[in-house]
C-alpha cells in the first residue's frame, strides 16, 4: 500500500500527455576472444534532451510497441520518453522519491511497462494507460537471515532481495531475477501469485552469482545473465536447466531481437557480444572507456532489430544509439 501511494506521482505523470540434461555451448569463452569485430557507429545526436535535464546513472532502456524509447536513470528525472526519431516527449516522475534504486524497465507484449526497483525490493506493472495494476514483492521487506556471520536471503512468498530484471511470457507468467541477495529466479502467475523459484548462490549449473538480466525467446526458453559467473544460463519455463554459455567478461545485460530468426546481444564491461540461440558468438564490438564510441558497464541494452542497439552506460551517465554497419564502413 505504501508503494502504491508513493508511486501516485509517477502513475499520474506516466501517460498524461547436453550432458545428463546439462549442455555447454562449446568453448564460448575462447570463441568470444576470436569472434569477429562487428563494425558500428553511433548516432551521437539521436537523443534530443532539453537543456535542463541531465541523466544520472544510466540503468535501463526499453521500447514499447510504438517504437518509443524509455530511458531509466537514477537522477531527478528518472524516466525519459523519446519518439522513434529521438525527439524528446516527456520526463516522468520528476523529483519523486519513488525509487530507492531504479534498476530495470521492460515492456511486455501487451505494452504493460514493468519497473524494477532493487532498493525497494519490488517489481511494479503499469498498464498502457499508466495505472499501477500489479506490484510484486514487499517494499523494503527483504527476507534475510544470518549464518556464520554472513547475511543471506530467505526466498519467501512475494519477497525479493534486490531484484534486477523481469520478463513476461505469452501466458502472462512473470519471471524475476532476484538478484543481488537471493541469487534465484522467481516465477509468478498472471495474477501475481508466486508459482515457484529456482537457484541459489554458487557456480554450478542452475546456481547463480548475481543473476542480473533475463530474456525469453520465441520458444519460451529463458536466458539468464549470471553476471559474476561470466555466463548465460538457459532454462525452460519450469526452471529446468538446459545450457550454459561461458563468456570472457561479466554478463551485465541482455536483449533479444524480435522476428523468426532471433539473436541475443549481451552487454558486458566495454563490450557487447552478439550470439545466436545456440550460444555461438557471432561477433563483438566496443572497448572500455567513457568517450563517445566507447562503453563502460553496460547496465541495460535494447535491440528492436539486428542492426540497432540502445545502450545504457551506467557510470558515464550516457545512453547510446548504436548502428551496426555493413562491412564497407570502418568501426570506431
Kindly give the residue locations of the regions a language model identified:
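Bacterial N-terminal signal peptides
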Residues: 6-18
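Eukaryotic scaffold repeat domains enriched in small/polar residues
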Residues: 18, 22-332
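Positively charged n-region of N-terminal signal peptides that target proteins for export
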Residues: 1-4
Amino acid at each position: 500500500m505504501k508503494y502504491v501511494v508513493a508511486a501516485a506521482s509517477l502513475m499520474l505523470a506516466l501517460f498524461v500527455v547436453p550432458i545428463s540434461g546439462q549442455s555447454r555451448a562449446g568453448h564460448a569463452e575462447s570463441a568470444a576472444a576470436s569472434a569477429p569485430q562487428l563494425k558500428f557507429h553511433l548516432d551521437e545526436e539521436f537523443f534530443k534532451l532539453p537543456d535542463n535535464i541531465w541523466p544520472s546513472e544510466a540503468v535501463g532502456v526499453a521500447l514499447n510497441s510504438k517504437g518509443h524509447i524509455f530511458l531509466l536513470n537514477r537522477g531527478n528525472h528518472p524516466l525519459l520518453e523519446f519518439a522513434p526519431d529521438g525527439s524528446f516527449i516527456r520526463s516522468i516522475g520528476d523529483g519523486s522519491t519513488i525509487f530507492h534504486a531504479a534498476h530495470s524497465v521492460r515492456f511486455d507484449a501487451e505494452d504493460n511497462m514493468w519497473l524494477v526497483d532493487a532498493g525497494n525490493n519490488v517489481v511494479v506493472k503499469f498498464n498502457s494507460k499508466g495505472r499501477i495494476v500489479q506490484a510484486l514483492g514487499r517494499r523494503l521487506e527483504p527476507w534475510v537471515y544470518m549464518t556464520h556471520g554472513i547475511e543471506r536471503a530467505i526466498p519467501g512468498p512475494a519477497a525479493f532481495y534486490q531484484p534486477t530484471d523481469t520478463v513476461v511470457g505469452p501466458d502472462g507468467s512473470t519471471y524475476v531475477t532476484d538478484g543481488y541477495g537471493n541469487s534465484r529466479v522467481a516465477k509468478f502467475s498472471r495474477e501475481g501469485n508466486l508459482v515457484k523459484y529456482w537457484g541459489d548462490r554458487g557456480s554450478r549449473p542452475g546456481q547463480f552469482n548475481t543473476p542480473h538480466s533475463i530474456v525469453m525467446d520465441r520458444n519460451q526458453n529463458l536466458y539468464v545473465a549470471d553476471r559474476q559467473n561470466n555466463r548465460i544460463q538457459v532454462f525452460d519455463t519450469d526452471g529446468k536447466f538446459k545450457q550454459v554459455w561461458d563468456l570472457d567478461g561479466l554478463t551485465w545485460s541482455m536483449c533479444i531481437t524480435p522476428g523468426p530468426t532471433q539473436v541475443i546481444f549481451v552487454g558486458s564491461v566495454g563490450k557487447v557480444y552478439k550470439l545466436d540461440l545456440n550460444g555461438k558468438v557471432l561477433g563483438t564490438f566496443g572497448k572500455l572507456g567513457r568517450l563517445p564510441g566507447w562503453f563502460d558497464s553496460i547496465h541495460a541494452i535494447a535491440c528492436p532489430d539486428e542492426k540497432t542497439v540502445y545502450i545504457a552506460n551506467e557510470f558515464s551517465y550516457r545512453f547510446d544509439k548504436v548502428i551496426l554497419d555493413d562491412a564497407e564502413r570502418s568501426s570506431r
